[in-house]
Amino acid sequence: MTLISDSQIVVALVSAFVTGILALRLGRELYR
């Protein structure tokens, strides 16, 4: 098993957060 470091967890959370924001913005633009 590979141990996941804290830095990798932070990067994963930030990337997921940014992806969610971009998806919400695209959704709002499409629903207008």
UniProtKB/Swiss-Prot annotation:
The chain crosses the membrane at residues 10-27. It is found in: Plastid, Chloroplast thylakoid membrane. It comes from the Eukaryota. GO terms for biological process: photosynthesis. One of its GO terms (cellular component) is photosystem I. The keyword Transmembrane applies. InterPro entries: PSI_PsaM (IPR010010), PSI_PsaM_sf (IPR037279). It is a single-pass membrane protein. Keywords: Chloroplast, Membrane, Photosynthesis, Photosystem I, Plastid, Thylakoid, Transmembrane, Transmembrane helix. Belongs to the PsaM family. HAMAP family: PSI_PsaM. This is Photosystem I reaction center subunit XII. The lineage of its organism: Eukaryota, Viridiplantae, Streptophyta, Zygnematophyceae, Zygnematophycidae.
